Amino acid sequence: MSELDYYQVLGVSRTASQEEIKRAYRKLVLKYHPDHNPGDKNAEQKIKNINEAYDILKDEKKRSAYDQLGHQTFKNSGGGNYQQHHGFTGGIDPNDIFENIFGDFMGARRSSKTAFSKKAGANLKYDISLTLEEAFYGVTKIISFKTALTCEACTGKGSLDNNSTSSCPTCRGSGVTRSQQGFFFFENTCQTCRGAGHVIKNPCTKCYGEGRYINTRNLEVKIPAGVKEGSRIKLTGEGEAGSRGGKTGDLYVCITLIPHNTFSVDGNDLHCQLDINCTTAALGGEVEVTDITGSKLKLKIPAGTQNNHKLKLSGKGMQILHSDRCGNMIVHVNIKVPKSLTKSQRELMIKLDKELNEASEEGFLSKVRNFWTSGSE
């Protein structure tokens, strides 16, 4: 049987980054998981090959050894060379050789092997888009996503009874296997028990001993009033389920605000544009504006208001998170000049322009006279 090319198994290049390897692994696991391919022996074999390849390539030391020496690096039969050149005659397990040399170290390793039997679930991130009104009032959303869920059949233990584990026959309870190439020893996570040091004699038929399985989850998320663009809501214990009773990860819901037709957001303030005519700007007056709640508000325009002037409506802005207060509503004034005039309107504008210019000239001449008069006294 030909040996697997671990890079081909995961569908990545030999220069792939760890992130690319991890992404490829997750994609393949979802595709060939037994829950999605019940009774498919080919899918079962592919999952085994995928796990084997990922176990080597995810570890930089193992990957480097594999790149240099290939599969021979991870074969226990490699110990034959060591025995032949040093007078050993059969029956010698590379594990025994390794433990004789590094016994104290491995003793410490064995004492912590239970850490491998439980694996914490990963934290998850979910992006959600809200309208500005939803962010203002707060909203409850139902989100749907694929993740690892705790197996109900075995309550996450991975076994169908409470006493179904035994020492792993491959690594003899150490959680690791050792191989030797020439004078070099290599240590790898045991493929049989995946580092746990024990195997399940009566594995759960639903999760295949994992204590979890992949499925779609629907979750109700309550989003508080006042969230902003980029706000992140942490839902403790709502992430990926742990393996064989491991701690469940957390879920982070990340907020994106959909652009609004009227308002833009700056901190807790809402900004909007208001068009007024030139006579209202000159004479002043009162106009009506609509806030984020849809309420109509009266806004006073001071006489002599200039273009791009900003007017503030206090407390009419965005809801402040975890507070009963609101920011301000900032109204930006745009003075609109008429594009066409009737004959009478044009005559009035010419008359007004003449009077304004005369008033301006009189004001200037008056200032000159006053200057010279005061200077001669």
Curated annotation (Swiss-Prot):
Q: Which domain of life is it from?
A: Bacteria
MF terms (GO), sorted A to Z: ATP binding; heat shock protein binding; unfolded protein binding; zinc ion binding
Residue positions annotated to bind Zn(2+) 1 are C151, C154, C204, C207
Q: Where in the cell is it found?
A: Cytoplasm
Q: Where are the zinc fingers (CR-type)?
A: 138-216
Q: What is its main location?
A: cytoplasm
Any Gene Ontology CC annotation: cytoplasm
Cross-referenced SMART domains, in alphabetical order?
DnaJ
Annotated Zn(2+) 2 binding lies at C168, C171, C190, C193
Question: How, per the record, is the cofactor bound?
Answer: Binds 2 Zn(2+) ions per monomer.
- Give the protein's function: Participates actively in the response to hyperosmotic and heat shock by preventing the aggregation of stress-denatured proteins and by disaggregating proteins, also in an autonomous, DnaK-independent fashion. Unfolded proteins bind initially to DnaJ; upon interaction with the DnaJ-bound protein, DnaK hydrolyzes its bound ATP, resulting in the formation of a stable complex. GrpE releases ADP from DnaK; ATP binding to DnaK triggers the release of the substrate protein, thus completing the reaction cycle.
* Protein's recorded name: Chaperone protein DnaJ
